[in-house]
A protein has these predicted regions:
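Soluble ligand-binding/transfer domains with enclosed cavities or grooves
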Residues: 2-187
Length: 188
C-alpha cells in the first residue's frame, strides 16, 4: 500500500489502520466476566456499524486538543442485539465511538460518545506494536476511569492474499468490581 499513486513510500501501520476504519460494516462481540467480576456481563452480541467522517471532536485534554485541532474523525455508530449468558431473550444495544488519527500519524485515539459528542470519554491511544508485527497495535497506556483500568490490543485480520478483512479489538477492564474481557470482531 502506498501513500499516493506512483509513490513508493509505504503508509505507516497506524495510517493503514485508520484507512481501514471506513470499510467496516459489521461487528460481533463477546464479553466474559472473570472470577473477580461483580458484574456478570458474560454474553454475545452482533450488529451493524454505520461509519461517517466528521470534524474532530475536541477532548477536554488541552494538549490533545491542540495536536488534533485540524484532524478529521471516523465515527462508528453501532447497533444490534446482545444476549447475556443464561437469558432467553436479547436486548438492543447502541454505541457511538470516535476514532481520531493523531497529528503526527503515530497514534489512533478512541473515545466513547455514549452520552453525546460533548460528553465524549477518551478511552486510549492505540500505537503500533512493532515487536508483534505491522498489523498489531496496543493501547499506549491503560486508561483509568474512576477505579477501573481499560487497556486494549488490536490486530488487523487479513485473507490469504493479504487483503484486510477487518480487525479484532480485545479489551481488558480491571478494577475493584470489574474483571472483564471484551472481544470485538469488526468486519468489512
Amino acid at each position: 500500500m502506498t501513500s499516493k499513486p506512483g509513490s513508493q513510500k509505504k503508509l505507516t501501520p497506524i495510517v493503514t489502520l485508520y484507512a481501514l476504519l471506513a470499510q467496516i460494516h459489521r461487528l460481533d462481540f463477546s464479553s466474559r466476566s472473570g472470577p473477580a467480576s461483580r458484574n456478570a456481563w458474560s454474553g454475545q452480541g452482533s450488529g451493524e456499524v454505520t461509519v461517517s467522517r466528521e470534524a474532530a471532536a475536541f477532548p477536554h485534554d488541552g494538549a490533545r486538543q491542540a495536536a488534533q485541532q485540524e484532524a478529521e474523525s471516523v465515527v462508528f455508530l453501532e447497533q444490534g442485539q446482545f444476549q447475556l449468558e443464561g437469558q432467553s431473550s436479547s436486548v438492543n444495544f447502541h454505541n457511538r465511538y470516535r476514532w481520531q488519527l493523531a497529528a503526527d500519524g503515530k497514534a489512533l485515539s478512541l473515545s466513547h460518545e455514549r452520552r453525546g459528542r460533548d460528553a465524549a470519554v477518551f478511552l486510549f491511544d492505540l500505537v503500533a506494536d512493532s515487536a508483534r508485527g505491522e498489523d498489531h497495535f496496543v493501547s499506549r497506556e491503560a486508561h483509568l476511569c474512576i477505579d477501573d483500568l481499560y487497556a486494549a490490543t488490536l490486530v488487523i485480520v487479513r485473507d490469504e492474499a493479504g487483503n484486510a478483512l477487518g480487525f479484532d479489538l480485545d479489551w481488558r477492564i480491571t478494577g475493584p468490581r470489574k474483571d472483564e474481557h471484551l472481544a470485538y470482531r469488526y468486519r468489512c
